[in-house]
Amino acid sequence: MAVCIAVIAKENYPLYIRSTPTENKLKFHYMVHTSLDVVDEKISAMGKALVDQRELYLGLLYPTEDYKMFRKLHNSYTDVMCNPFYNPGDRIQSRAFDNMVTSMMIQVC
Amino acid sequence: MEAAAAAAAAAAGGGCGSGPPPLLLSEGEQQCYSELFARCAGAAGGGPGSGPPEAARVAPGTATAAAGPVADLFRASQLPAETLHQITELCGAKRVGYFGPTQFYIALKLIAAAQSGLPVRIESIKCELPLPRFMMSKNDGEIRFGNPAELHGTKVQIPYLTTEKNSFKRMDDEDKQQETQSPTMSPLASPPSSPPHYQRVPLNHGYSKLRSSAEQMHPAPYEARQPLVQPEGSSSGGPGTKPLRHQASLIRSFSVERELQDNSSYPDEPWRITEEQREYYVNQFRSLQPDPSSFISGSVAKNFFTKSKLSIPELSYIWELSDADCDGALTLPEFCAAFHLIVARKNGYPLPEGLPPTLQPEYLQAAFPKPKWDCQLFDSYSESLPANQQPRDLNRMEKTSVKDMADLPVPTQDVTSDDKQALKSTINEALPKDVSEDPATPKDSNSLKARPRSRSYSSTSIEEAMKRGEDPPTPPPRPQKTHSRASSLDLNKVFQPSVPATKSGLLPPPPALPPRPCPSQSEQVSEAELLPQLSRAPSQAAESSPAKKDVPYSQPPSKPIRRKFRPENQATENQEPSTAASGPASAATMKPHPTVQKQSSKQKKAIQTAIRKNKEANAVLARLNSELQQQLKEVHQERIALENQLEQLRPVTVL
């Protein structure tokens, strides 16, 4: 079901981005970038609603995810992080991560 | 080699095929053949074969070769009888009636050609060929041309690095094993000098033992290989140009390791760790981490493996392969696997797609059981899949597991993390789905091990999100000691089963200050709120925050992320003694409560909106409130006492 998977760094550049070849990759790159705006908007919201909103936004994504993707992604991401040879900010070149992403893109597609 | 072949071709072309053509052998072949000839001659009772009359004799023309050693040798080559007859004919033994050195050598070369699938012709032996292979019995470490009845089906592979790999492709059935051997042997960098190769021959039959289904494979090759280590080790030309002695020794050790790898790399199993390699790895492990049952942290391992001069992506991939449970640290079997992969890579082997079964931690622990590894054994047995193991490995694992289960300590963090995760309501529902989703892939053991850890990481994500939200700390409004804040802390304690452990991670145990954003927040909070405690708060924060940060990392084995989510009680108990030492006992331990409550309340509110308050919380709130008031008074008093001391000291310092 996933047609595009991207991991964005803090500095808004992609650490990892991959999309199924059927669609135009550029379009997905744009989409990812615009989604960053949505996240920023959520984060920058002021007031008490901030935490609630964000939690609703992100929190629901995680525990109640319909597609069991985020967890796997996050687990693989932490695996990559655990690797002492990985410098934060590098592109993600882990084969295990690639395999997991491939499996996710294939699985429900 | 090519010159010799060309010369032989020229000579053969010059002289027709009537008599045995002058044969120029390579140095390797020369040595090998002369040895074989000597054995035949010696076995025949003659002296070392130098002169033709001393050579063994074989009755020409007999269908079944005589019991002479030469005949035995030829039979040991496992060629059909007619081929052998052809060979004896071609080499000229039949013509001259005996096996002189020339005939013998030609015959050997023809045998090699026949074994390579080439037709038995004089022209065949003009090209480079592998050394002939003979079936040997495994009496002791030496080659014996035993009787056919004694042959146990083992094969001796005389390694022979040749440029003509295509000749390996055409093989008989029995040479199929060599087909896998030679491509893997060829990348080895050692020069094809014959004596070490030949000396390796009697030991190599140990390798074939492993390939065949005979038992007792492991001890003999390991023992046999040891005497070979010395001559090979001396020939290892380690680049000792590194200025640092440590690095020089390391580089030399890596090149020695390469030699060890040469000796011990089973032709078809380069991923098997031998005994010497194992010992070497264990010694290196000990140099990094004295306790063999503990871990090497990621940074230490990174520094160590970086010295191997492999590229970072490769090291990263090796780490990925070898760190089976992906915890950022290497246990002894993981370390051995990683080291072995590095050595293999340096020797030119391409890195495998997945961790080979002989390098998996369960296998390594089973193959080399040591009492110190009991805890890891238990860890692996609780999660290992037998599917990957070969039958004999399973037997060994079962034996060791039965032996060691009795001594095993309390379950490791994987199991405890399971318990912790059971507490999380939000994760539980996802658990069975995740486990059921994972198919039985070769990586199942890894994925299974990853599952418990994944649950702990799932909590991390929420927590991290919360923390990041709090990171720019805003000074809270002043008097914040309300019921809600106090209640939040108690809710943690009371609702520990129901509250996600993220809270506990966020809320560092009360006596110590929470990590990262908290010290700054706590400072601000204390400034705002408790003026009397102002002087002590920063110092306390400074004291406790390093203490708090140190505690998770100092907890053995160093797995800080997981440790953070241990049940709060345990963490609380751990924290309390540590901070008690830093400050006044009871007051200090209770002092951070208000500060923690304030900041945690802010952080908690978001989560608490999702949690329902019930009446127990209210009762606890009231109780806590009274307790806090009392402690506040005590802290006040201590602060006053400290200020007095400060006043007393001040005049002294001024002077």
UniProtKB/Swiss-Prot annotation, chain A:
One of its GO terms (biological process) is endoplasmic reticulum to Golgi vesicle-mediated transport. InterPro entries: Longin-like_dom_sf, Sedlin, TRAPPC2L. It holds the Pfam family Sedlin_N. Its main location: cytoplasm. Gene3D superfamilies: 3.30.450.70. CDD domains: TRAPPC2L (cd14854). Keywords: Cytoplasm, Endoplasmic reticulum, ER-Golgi transport, Golgi apparatus, Transport. It is found in: Cytoplasm, Perinuclear region; Endoplasmic reticulum; Golgi apparatus. One of its GO terms (cellular component) is Golgi apparatus. The keyword Transport applies. PANTHER family: TRAFFICKING PROTEIN PARTICLE COMPLEX SUBUNIT 2. Belongs to the TRAPP small subunits family. Sedlin subfamily. Component of the multisubunit TRAPP (transport protein particle) complex, which includes at least TRAPPC2, TRAPPC2L, TRAPPC3, TRAPPC3L, TRAPPC4, TRAPPC5, TRAPPC8, TRAPPC9, TRAPPC10, TRAPPC11 and TRAPPC12. Interacts with the heterodimer TRAPPC3-TRAPPC6A. May play a role in vesicular transport from endoplasmic reticulum to Golgi. This is Trafficking protein particle complex subunit 2-like protein. It comes from Pongo abelii (Sumatran orangutan). The lineage of its organism: Eukaryota, Metazoa, Chordata, Craniata, Vertebrata. The gene is TRAPPC2L.
